[in-house]
């Protein structure tokens, strides 16, 4: 297997979804693409892909935004991991997380999917839950609002001013985990004042 990392930003395709909370993973990938340099190209695995390094001499990464809907992300992720010969331990899924407050980033490996159908599909396709997750907090829906309706809406006006900072923090978390490991990233992002 290779030392390359597959970094996957989860979301839904199409401009009507591009600013939704559910697409925050793909927004983070756009920030990482800016850092890597270059532009995404269509890959036969049904994903937009950018290959490069995170910094000079940094780890080799494949940034990927599946062209499928969120809930069926597993096929493209599995196909890319096979194409690039990447073990699940080197797969990082960047996704929205309603159980974490907005403007917060958490990391973990394995465990449950917390009702996140995109993660569930990736776990099924990879035949393991043991891949890394960068969980980008979008908060819980207000009142009795349906969770699906909440994540399929754009960020609130009050959140939009802080969104660039959240995307930057999440991209930094991805860089930390691939450069220094999960423990270092968790120490930084689970104990830091956000």
Curated annotation (Swiss-Prot):
It catalyses: an N-acyl-L-alpha-aminoacyl-tRNA + H2O = an N-acyl-L-amino acid + a tRNA + H(+). GO terms for biological process: protein quality control for misfolded or incompletely synthesized proteins; rescue of stalled ribosome. CDD domains: PTH. It comes from the Bacteria. InterPro entries: Pept_tRNA_hydro, Pept_tRNA_hydro_CS, Pept_tRNA_hydro_sf. TRNA binds at residues 17, 69, 71, 117. Gene3D superfamilies: Peptidyl-tRNA hydrolase. One of its GO terms (cellular component) is cytoplasm. It is found in: Cytoplasm. The active site is at 22 (proton acceptor). Keywords: Cytoplasm, Hydrolase, RNA-binding, tRNA-binding. One of its GO terms (molecular function) is peptidyl-tRNA hydrolase activity. The record marks 12 as: Discriminates between blocked and unblocked aminoacyl-tRNA. Its EC number is 3.1.1.29. The keyword Hydrolase applies. The keyword DNA-binding does not apply. It holds the Pfam family Pept_tRNA_hydro. The record marks 96 as: Stabilizes the basic form of H active site to accept a proton. Monomer. Hydrolyzes ribosome-free peptidyl-tRNAs (with 1 or more amino acids incorporated), which drop off the ribosome during protein synthesis, or as a result of ribosome stalling. Catalyzes the release of premature peptidyl moieties from peptidyl-tRNA molecules trapped in stalled 50S ribosomal subunits, and thus maintains levels of free tRNAs and 50S ribosomes. Belongs to the PTH family. NCBIfam families: pth (TIGR00447). This is Peptidyl-tRNA hydrolase.
